[in-house]
């Protein structure tokens, strides 16, 4: 019988250690990802209050959250994708303000709270409404990227709303869709260089709204976001400017 030489046995041990090391590293990366993904931004007081139906708006909380104007014919709808790791209830104040002006608004629940993992979720929303003749999609931060990817591939989407966001490619430029891009001047999260450069990727008639003193987190109501700057305007003011800009944009969709 031939016995393994010491050299081959050493080699086996080294390989074994390397594989074990890779295995441990993989587990640690996975663990880190799950810890990161489970630390979400949660809705605060204003958001929770906005989830209650009133005389103007019916709020329905299922997998998604829909805001339906009461007592009026609704023919335009806005689908909203959340920012990364932001729980969708956080966008209730904005959605409600828009719905009060007569538009259906649906905030879409995403896998692991990452819109990029559920880019096509808007399709199911659109399929579930018979009364909506005009659809617009929008998103906050990473949600805007996912929303623009969906809009790029869907002929029935007539407009795109970017909140502290921008598209990855220039596909929207020539598609004939309306676009509005809104951001806060004190945003500490968005990459301003990419935001400015994205103007080249958007249609020539895009509407741009810079909210003086607004930041990244005040498009929702989920507290302070890591890396963000303090806003120098109130949350209410930022929400009002955002909602009014979107309402004006929706009016012009036809």
Q: Which residue stretches match the model-derived regions?
A:
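Short, small-residue-biased leader/transition segments that mark boundaries at the very start
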Residues: 1-8
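Short beta-strand element of the alpha/beta-hydrolase
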Residues: 75-83
């Amino acid at each position: 019988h031939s016995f393994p030489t010491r050299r081959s046995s050493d080699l086996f041990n080294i390989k074994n250690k390397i594989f074990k090391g890779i295995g441990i590293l993989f587990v640690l990366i996975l663990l880190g990802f799950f810890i990161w993904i489970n630390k979400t931004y949660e809705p605060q007081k204003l958001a929770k209050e906005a989830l209650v139906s009133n005389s103007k708006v019916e709020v329905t909380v299922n997998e998604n959250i829909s805001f339906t104007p009461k007592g009026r014919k609704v023919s335009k709808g806005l689908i909203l994708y959340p920012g990364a790791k932001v729980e969708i209830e956080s966008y209730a104040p904005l959605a409600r303000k828009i719905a009060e002006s007569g538009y259906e608004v649906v905030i879409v629940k995403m896998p692991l709270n990452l819109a990029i993992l559920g880019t096509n979720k808007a399709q199911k929303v659109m399929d579930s409404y018979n009364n909506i003749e005009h659809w617009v999609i929008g998103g906050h931060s990473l949600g805007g990227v996912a929303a623009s990817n969906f809009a790029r591939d869907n002929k029935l989407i007539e407009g795109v709303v970017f909140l502290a966001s921008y598209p990855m490619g220039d596909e929207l430029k020539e598609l004939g869709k309306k676009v509005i891009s809104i951001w806060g001047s004190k945003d500490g999260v968005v990459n301003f260089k990419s935001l400015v450069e994205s103007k080249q990727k958007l249609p020539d008639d895009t509407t741009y709204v810079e909210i003086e003193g607004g930041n990244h987190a005040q498009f929702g109501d989920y507290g302070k976001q890591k890396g963000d700057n303090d806003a120098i305007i109130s949350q209410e003011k930022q929400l009002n400017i955002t909602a009014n800009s979107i309402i004006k944009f929706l009016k012009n969709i036809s």
